[in-house]
């Protein structure tokens, strides 16, 4: 895998070129630190290295396999809703956020995937077409 360093502007340009429905992965900073052992998370733990409950390492980043083209992440909780239509790269990037479909989530009913949003400033790396785009 080739590492390519890009700026925030380069990140925005890269995201706009990704076609709807195309699978890629990204690493970004979590809103709240999460314990990898007990699964608990809390924003007040962001400055800690270890979980105050069980003492294990806290995760500050999240890795997800994602797809773009999300229609409405707040109202769509089941895979298949929203499909990959109705939203261009520019629309997915509104208000400093990236809307995406997270393929790594397993729902209570056994189905996979969840519609989500993340702050663009928190994206640290994107894996696409055999390249790792590292945001500086």
Which positions does each model-derived feature cover?
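Short, compact, well-ordered microdomains
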Residues: 95-136
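Short cysteine-rich clusters marking metal-coordination/redox-active sites
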Residues: 35-38, 51-54
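Phosphate-interacting basic helix/loop segments used at nucleotide- and nucleic-acid interfaces
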Residues: 2-24
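Short, conserved turn/kink motifs that form compact alpha/beta structural patches or helix kinks used as
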Residues: 51-52, 61-111
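A short, sequence-level motif marking secondary-structure junctions
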Residues: 45-46, 67-76, 119-125
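Residues immediately within or flanking Cys/His clusters that coordinate Zn2+
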Residues: 32, 48
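Short conserved beta-strand and strand-loop elements enriched in small hydrophobics
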Residues: 24-28, 100
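Cys/His-rich microdomains that often coordinate metals
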Residues: 39-43, 58-60
């Amino acid at each position: 895998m080739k590492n390519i360093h890009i700026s925030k502007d380069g990140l925005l340009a890269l995201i706009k070129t990704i076609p709807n429905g195309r699978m890629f992965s990204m690493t970004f900073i979590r809103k709240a630190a999460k314990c990898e052992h007990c699964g608990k998370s809390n924003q007040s733990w962001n400055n800690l290295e270890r979980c105050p409950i069980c003492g294990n390492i806290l995760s500050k980043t999240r890795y997800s396999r994602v797809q773009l083209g999300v229609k409405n992440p707040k109202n769509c909780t089941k895979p298949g809703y929203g499909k990959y239509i109705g939203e261009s790269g520019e629309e997915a990037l509104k208000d400093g956020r990236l809307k995406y479909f997270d393929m790594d989530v397993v729902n209570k009913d056994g189905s996979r995937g969840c519609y989500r949003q993340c702050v663009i400033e928190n994206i640290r790396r994107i894996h696409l077409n055999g390249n790792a785009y590292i945001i500086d």
